[in-house]
Amino acid sequence: MKRKILIIGNSAKEYAIAKKLSEKHDIFVTPASDAMKEFATCLDIREDASAEILEFVMENDIDLTIPVSIKALKSDIVELFNQNNQTIFAPVKNACKLMFDKALAKKILYKLRIPTPKFGIFEKQNMAMDYIKNLKNPFVIKTDDSNSATVFTNTQTAKTFIDSLFIEKNKRVIIEDYIYGTPFSFYTITDGYKALPIGSSITYKHSLEGDGGQLTSGMGACSPNYKLTLEQEYYLMDNVIYPTLDYCEIEGNPYLGILGVNGILTEDGRIFVLGWQSFMQDCDATAVLEVLDEDLYELFKSCVVGSFSDEIEGINLYNKYASSLVLTCKNKVNAENAILGLDNLDEETKITFYPSVNKNKYLEFEAEYGANIILTTSGVTASKAVDKMYLEAEDIEFKGKSFRRDICKFKI
């Protein structure tokens, strides 16, 4: 039976979950991107307009609402829906502080004795300057309320950056050691009490090959993470996921939804946790969902109605790998820049669009400066998925096309 599902948000991860759910259900999205119109009914309601969204849901008999965007999760939408007996799959606002308050997240990691890079939190510029004097290069600087982070190998450059952060009225700055290793994400689904793994990924955050350039929201991914052993997954469940759920419950904010962990896996097998995710990331959502063999509506709803703990014993995954590649445009031009070759791709290849991509008057998708497309392919091995991904990437054409050429390009 087809259900009506509302997704809140318009980035690549919202596109990925909406497209996956549209295979079986009727999808509504707000404030949808232009590309989503091909498979969803697109609305024009602000993602933090909780009362207006609730009114739409009640008037249109929506079966399930899934707030994904940060702005939506920071609003009171979950509490408002619960008060009005509407089915919503997401954590309450106070439980989400783990993701949106980076300084708080580091303090909680320390409190729960979860391994995390050595760090300092600073509200005064001079104290931050003193801290980096004795740090070994490289190190990472990030702000309290931002997902971006910058790696520094030069103290003087870092001081200039810290100057700019405090000039911009950032209240707190976080400085932490840089950990060498493989970045990973590990995702679970939970009703607040029981949690089950739903997927993992190797993520590539640096903009250039060989992990050079700036840290980004992601340039590619592979799922499942073939470097993460079963024992390490057990470790994450027992020492990160469940302590986090216990903490949220003790604080009076049981965490219901997708609970993800971002971390670093070192060469000697140690795990360092960088922070939590309230959903999948733009760069890995399509890959993780491609491997997931579940009716997401039934899975999500079981958490909301209270049947998850009793009825769901495990999560089914396809016996395959999926790899994703972010295609960016490096041209800052206002001229038309049609994306060509999409019709030539294999029918099993998944295309996920960023919200910057719109259609021109000829009904062609157009590339804009920055991230545009996530191309995802699958195979029985990670290497087969990756080889196919790069072959497909060559078929897509637009001016200024750029992508990393080393995603999963090492011994598997």
List where the protein language model places each region.
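Internal nucleotide-binding/catalytic subdomain
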Residues: A149-T286
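A conserved helix-loop-beta module that forms one wall/lid of the active-site cleft
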Residues: F89-T150, Q156
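Generic C-terminus detector
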Residues: N358-Y362, E366-I412
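ATP-binding N-terminal substructure of ATP-dependent carboxylate-amine bond-forming enzymes
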Residues: M1-K93
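Short beta-strand-to-loop capping motifs
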Residues: T153-T155, T188-T190, L327-C329, L375-G379
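Active-site "cap" helix and flanking loop/linker of ATP-utilizing ligase/carboxylase catalytic domains
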Residues: M237-G260, Q277-T349, N358
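Short, flexible turn/loop "capping" segments at secondary-structure junctions
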Residues: D144, L317-N319, F365-G370
